[in-house]
């Protein structure tokens, strides 16, 4: 058969993301993470209200834990919504 091999497909799938915006937090230096700092926390939340992954934001494991805890506290205090804007 003259089709593409699975190795060729994997290379295509693993390629650079086309059309995506730059990671929002890679240029942000995270200092003190506070649940009351909603403007900073919004940079780590997707449009649907989910906490962005480390591989997207580029923060360390410790910083990701602090961000997740701060986002959850801010949601509990009604500073951030639990769900995003939806459709």
From Swiss-Prot:
InterPro entries reported for this sequence: Ribosomal_bS18 (IPR001648), Ribosomal_bS18_CS (IPR018275), Ribosomal_bS18_sf (IPR036870)
CC per GO annotation: cytosolic small ribosomal subunit
GO biological process, one term: translation
Any GO MF annotation of the entry: small ribosomal subunit rRNA binding
Domain of life assignment: Bacteria
Disordered: region residues: 1-23
Functional description taken from the UniProt entry: Binds as a heterodimer with protein bS6 to the central domain of the 16S rRNA, where it helps stabilize the platform of the 30S subunit.
Quaternary structure and interacting proteins, as annotated: Part of the 30S ribosomal subunit. Forms a tight heterodimer with protein bS6.
NCBIfam families, A to Z: S18
Protein name: Small ribosomal subunit protein bS18
Top-level taxonomy: Bacteria, Bacillati, Actinomycetota, Actinomycetes, Micrococcales
Gene: rpsR
């Amino acid at each position: 058969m003259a089709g593409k091999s699975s190795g060729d497909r994997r290379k295509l799938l693993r390629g650079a993301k086309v059309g995506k915006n730059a990671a929002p937090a890679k240029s942000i230096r995270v200092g003190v993470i506070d649940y009351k700092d909603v403007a900073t926390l919004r940079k780590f939340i997707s449009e649907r209200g989910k906490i962005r992954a480390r591989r997207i934001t580029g923060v360390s494991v410790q910083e990701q834990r602090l961000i997740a805890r701060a986002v959850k506290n801010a949601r509990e205090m009604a500073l951030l919504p639990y769900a995003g804007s939806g459709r």
